[in-house]
């Protein structure tokens, strides 16, 4: 369904996310395609991290240094600090029927750019009285991230409806080596420090998982979103 096929009564859905490695963006794109196919008017808003204390390390990918590029964020993240961001116009105001947040995990919890948005006046304007969902993209740690998004969104007047996680392959040590290798090289490698490592980033079946969850969200907007093909089975909440 094209934007020309959207009617004035189509459900309006907003995605707000941060994505430096483009993994959260890939999930957003996959879900947005499904929701548009179900007759929704979908807006996608990517938060930009502009804080002068950290932004220089996030201007390019891969990082100049896989560890020291992100290490300055450890203490601020553990203290749940906010930072300067640029908010797209779509996420500043609008009468949306559903808002969905995409949140990569940074040091166990919600990344600073999305946290900063969720604590903003703009988020309160968008969320007040509205249902919202969230998806977490992470190596392993997802639950604290999802709980924080839920807590912050609810505090801004939103009503949490569902959440899901997209995790990477591998155990604790090997998945960390894979991610750091990708941060530093910008490409998948089979070994790091002489150790065989699994692929990092989203698993090959993430698209099916995203489609199922998006269809579940579309079903929650019924009957207005009963356009196109509905989900065959519900997605499990994270």
Role assignments for model-derived ranges:
Residues 60-65, 151-152, 179-182:
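Short, hinge-like loop/turn segments at secondary-structure boundaries
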Residues 110, 142-145, 206:
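Conserved donor sugar-nucleotide recognition element shared by glycan-biosynthetic enzymes
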Residues 131-178:
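Short, glycine-/small-residue-rich phosphate/pyrophosphate-handling segment
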Residues 98-102, 130-136, 194-195:
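Short acidic, glycine/Ser/Thr-rich loop/turn "cap" segments at secondary-structure junctions
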Residues 1-103, 108-112, 116-119, 123-128, ...:
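N-terminal beta1-alpha1-beta2 submodule of the flavodoxin-like/Rossmannoid cofactor-binding fold
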Residues 167-238:
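Glycine-rich phosphate/pyrophosphate-binding loop and the adjoining helix
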